[in-house]
From Swiss-Prot:
Pathway: Protein modification; lipoprotein biosynthesis (diacylglyceryl transfer). A 1,2-diacyl-sn-glycero-3-phospho-(1'-sn-glycerol) binds at residue 129. Its main location: membrane. Pfam families: LGT. It comes from the Bacteria. It is found in: Cell inner membrane. Keywords: Cell inner membrane, Cell membrane, Membrane, Transferase, Transmembrane, Transmembrane helix. InterPro entries: Lgt (IPR001640). This is Phosphatidylglycerol--prolipoprotein diacylglyceryl transferase. It is a multi-pass membrane protein.
Amino acid sequence: MFPEVISVFGLKISLYGILVALGVLVGYFLVLKLAKREGLNTKAVENTFMIAVLFGVIGARIAYILEHPYEFHSLVDFLALWKGGVSFYGGLIGGIIGALIGIKVFNLPLWKSADIAAPAIALAHFFGRLGCTSAGCCYGKPFPYATSNEVGIHFSDKFPFFYVVFPKGAVAPPFTPLYPTQLMEAFGNLLIFFVLLFAYRYKPFSGFVFSLYLMLYGFERFFLEFFRGVTPPIPGIGLTWNQVVSLVLIAGSILLMFLLKNQKSNVVDYEV
């Protein structure tokens, strides 16, 4: 809704970038807090976090470029991250790869590390989707029950009971009532965050919280894709690539839970 906040020496600073940075910062402090509670080496956790973020950014950009190659015409387009254009699933995969490298290099326990990362990812993603709302990226399909096309957030008696209209200059089509998929996902991520914090307190085995995160987000994203207007469905199956990845995520999380629960030596965490 507010693509640009201020301009410093001609450089325009977007609310999107500020909120994404805030999400990373909040996630960083949450990871450190949980790492101390687990008795982990905080310096090793810090370094692993930085590697995961770097790989996550690279993965998010590469995945978006592969999904939307027609949007990129020059090197500047490829590097202009401040304009948006990242894929969360690409970032998640890249972040996991980076985290595995850090866990291996700094000799951290795998599943304890995964469990402290899961709530931080969900909370950071909440701020990220608020950023998407400000920029207008990741927008929804046209809302068919709209009664106004004035810029702003409008309430409705039809699900999801509100819709958004973006101004000119946003990534989303201007002055068009749309499903508020960014806000729907943002508050879905916030709910997942609180569920994970509760689960973290009472987790039955290491790796449970991370597995639960993959499952919950997989369900959330699969559902939301029906309302998103960004990624077209795959011909022949009617599902988007994000929905296919979501189904794989759900199935993988259930399998992971089963394997971790039934490991006889689960009282001892694993290193990679």
